[in-house]
């Protein structure tokens, strides 16, 4: 009798743990939008097959959504696929989103969510949305979840125009694109996604073909934070722009979890400009920067990640132009990360040999407060054969250099000049 009660309890628990799959279908309606408008607050099935659209699909209200094995093809490069705005508990599951051949390049997202709460985007496949915007973009959202999605080929050739900034003062050709972008959002979970770029990898041939890094415009006066060599050469090495995952707005973003994602061939793997962030159990493979936290990022826990074949840094912490006295960087932990095959990435030819697996840097402007109080423990830099880096760890010096860094119980394979450019204090 006791075992029967346990079994019955288990059945009841599991039957309640998973909601019944949606049964209402968009089939029979003139369009997916018409089906949503006729069924507010319902999650509708998009059946297998191709469903072409030329205008974005708008999801609003509470409890609406789309799910199913259908493929939504956006034929208009001037529109995203889905726009979710001022909504609560919207679900988007199991869909494929694509653009037709010849219309892949766009300046728009595939999914954009604005001022949403309890949003779920799960098991969605987004292929060949070549955009300088985030393929999945969340703005001013709370408690959203993006899980088990595939974003493949999200970059495009673009112009990064910094001529309006006194700090920079130039525009240049670049590759650009971000797979998942969070801006001014809190309480979000980004887990178990696969993000891969297979087209615009940083080879010499791709650079020459598109003139990547070449200035296309330059102000009469040199930017305040631009070095003379770059300015006079009319060329920037940093022509890989964008990130696989970026979290923006450190004063307005918090409680973000980036867990168990697989990232391949990104420019920057994970780019953090936020407070109270967990970056854990991710793979970042063949990015020129594995991850960085800057522009006033505080209380960032970087734990248990693997960084493979990164080219400039695997992990970098530093202030930036977004940092100020009320928005400083630090109070963070870097623990139990494994860095391997550093310097073997596709972008290694760009950056020379003054790179390092770990970089703790000073700010970009004189008034940037220094990075402070970071615990670095239990990390491994693994190197087989001759190292392709000068030091495993570089810590910037000077009055504005990092303060209060503590290193303990790490295994750092030395570079050709040693483990670090400074003594690493426990």
Task: Go through each PLM region and give its residues.
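Bacterial N-terminal signal peptides
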Residues: 6-16
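Extracellular beta-strand-rich solenoid/capping regions of secreted or surface-exposed proteins
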Residues: 33, 37-38, 52-65, 73-119, ...
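Short "repeat-start/strand-capping" segments in structured domains, especially the N-termini
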Residues: 61-62, 87-88, 116-118, 141-143, ...
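Acidic, glycine- and Ser/Thr-rich low-complexity intrinsically disordered tracts
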Residues: 170, 210-235, 353-426
